Amino acid sequence: MNPKVPMTLEGAQQLKEELKRRKTTDRKRIIAAIEEARAHGDLSENAEYHAAKEQQSFNEGRIAKLEGMLASAEVIDTSRLNSSRIVFGAKVTVIDEDTEEESTYHIVGDEEADLEKGKISISSPMARGMIGKEAGDSIEVRAPGGTRHFEVVEITF
């Protein structure tokens, strides 16, 4: 049995939408491309056919991966959380104690992480350093670039 992997409700919904799109729209489009390429004759030297088959393989692989992720997901509705401590699903505002730069991070599951959107994985060094802390606490994060220090400013859900 696969261990359960934490995932936000939003993250699970995004994966379900991608899965639905890949099973319906993308699959149909790829099948049509394969059929069209087959109509061109000799498949051994048909680049369009091979490209479409490669797309099909990638799409089916991604479908299998999405189904696996959703099957092992422990979906957590973060809107129902309320804690003074940092836990999975929290949105945490911190100040870098060296640069005085303020940043906000949303602690999410591994598959949802997107640093550009401020979403960090629960298994990242930053999130691991935050878990259990409260507003006003200092965080020490050991990362490949060295140790950094932050102060927790605000925790929201």
UniProtKB/Swiss-Prot annotation:
Keywords: Coiled coil, DNA-binding, Transcription, Transcription regulation. InterPro entries: GreA/GreB_C_sf, TF_GreA/GreB_CS, Tscrpt_elong_fac_GreA, Tscrpt_elong_fac_GreA/B, Tscrpt_elong_fac_GreA/B_C, Tscrpt_elong_fac_GreA/B_fam, Tscrpt_elong_fac_GreA/B_N, Tscrpt_elong_fac_GreA/B_N_sf. One of its GO terms (molecular function) is DNA binding. Signal peptide: none annotated. Residues 9-30 form a coiled coil. GO terms for biological process: DNA-templated transcription elongation; regulation of DNA-templated transcription elongation. Belongs to the GreA/GreB family. HAMAP family: GreA_GreB. Necessary for efficient RNA polymerase transcription elongation past template-encoded arresting sites. The arresting sites in DNA have the property of trapping a certain fraction of elongating RNA polymerases that pass through, resulting in locked ternary complexes. Cleavage of the nascent transcript by cleavage factors such as GreA or GreB allows the resumption of elongation from the new 3'terminus. GreA releases sequences of 2 to 3 nucleotides. This is Transcription elongation factor GreA. The lineage of its organism: Bacteria, Pseudomonadati, Pseudomonadota, Alphaproteobacteria, Magnetococcales.
